[in-house]
Amino acid sequence: VYDLYDLGEFDQKGSVATKYGTKAEYLAAIHTCQEYGIDVYADIVLNHKIGADGTEIINAEECNTGNREQETTGIEQITAWTIFNFPGRKGKYSDFVWTSKCFDGVDWDDKQKKNSIYLFEGKEWDKDVDSENGNYDYLMGADIDFSEPEVIAELTKWGKWYLDQTQVDGFR
């Protein structure tokens, strides 16, 4: 949920290997499964990002954690971890930089050192989601805004790249 392009190839967040090993080990595991007739489907998290590289000052409303459709404050400035520029990858495969424009909200205000759910000004939670907690679009981290054309374009580009790199049978 940090860098979708890093399959265990770049020194990022203190390690080159991911929880699946290096890129070579990951690709070998996929290939070995397929050699034995096992279809490989990757379980990819596309809802949110965690582990940002920098912060931005953003206007947001704090939401009721029991009902995310209810704001508990007016608009206030928060400091949110929303910049993802992947310095370890240095633009290889994609130079897209994720900023607050790419997200609906976060769960941490670094200014107040406060954990809560914050909806960015001018944004809304997705509608076609479970109604638990009023609206269960928000789960954790920086919630990706799928109404932004640049986000859709980047994730589409990544999906094609990922299928080409890994040769998996699909992903969800």
Regions found by a protein language model. Give the residues of each.
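Substrate-binding/active-site clefts of carbohydrate-active enzymes
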Residues: 1-166
